[in-house]
């Protein structure tokens, strides 16, 4: 009897969660079309087509140019990006949008995860957390299927939370293309 009550309670909350996810936001908008620069976000560990050492140098120069406290983490970023088969430019683009590459972040959280209520011991730990979240969580399944940045951001920073999703996508693509 007790197990049956628990089952019904869990089933109720699960159906509520699914329903709220389905009906959240304005579904009349068309997703932003993929561009060549972001088309392979989940498909290629080295999206730039250059060697990993050249990617490392490019990341180091980018972080130095922006005076980022994330400087020195290039190896970890490339390793984690390769391990989870996610474009490192996506991670850096989100970090730039959310915290100016860690300058406005808190507790080694350059991605604004949980509105900074979640802290990390290092930027490397934050990279791995976000890479794993994006590549494993059911919330991002649409994005993994399409590779469309809009499908990622409409969940990562939804309009229902006050986010300007279209602007976020536009800026994210711009940041990614800088790399």
Per-segment meaning from a language model:
Residues 86-88:
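Helix N-cap / loop-to-helix initiation motif
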Residues 1-33, 117-179:
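Non-catalytic cell-wall polysaccharide-engagement segments
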Residues 1-84, 174-179:
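Cell-wall glycan-active module
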Residues 83, 100-101, 158-159:
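A short structural micro-motif
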């Amino acid at each position: 009897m007790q197990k049956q009550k628990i089952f019904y309670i869990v089933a109720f909350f699960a159906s509520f969660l699914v329903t709220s996810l389905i009906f959240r936001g304005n579904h009349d908008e068309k997703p932003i079309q993929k561009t060549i620069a972001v088309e392979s976000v989940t498909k290629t560990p080295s999206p730039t087509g250059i060697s990993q050492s050249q990617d490392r140098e490019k990341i180091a120069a980018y972080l130095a140019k922006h005076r980022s406290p994330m400087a020195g983490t290039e190896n970890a970023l490339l390793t984690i990006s390769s391990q989870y088969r996610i474009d490192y430019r996506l991670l850096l683009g989100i970090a730039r949008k959310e915290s100016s590459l860690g300058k406005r972040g808190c507790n080694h959280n350059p991605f604004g995860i949980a509105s900074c209520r979640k802290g990390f011991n290092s930027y490397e730990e934050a990279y791995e957390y976000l890479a794993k979240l994006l590549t494993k969580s059911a919330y991002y399944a649409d994005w993994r299927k399409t590779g469309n940045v809009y499908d990622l951001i409409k969940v990562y920073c939804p309009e229902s939370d006050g986010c300007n999703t279209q602007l976020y996508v536009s800026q994210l693509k711009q940041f990614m293309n800088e790399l």
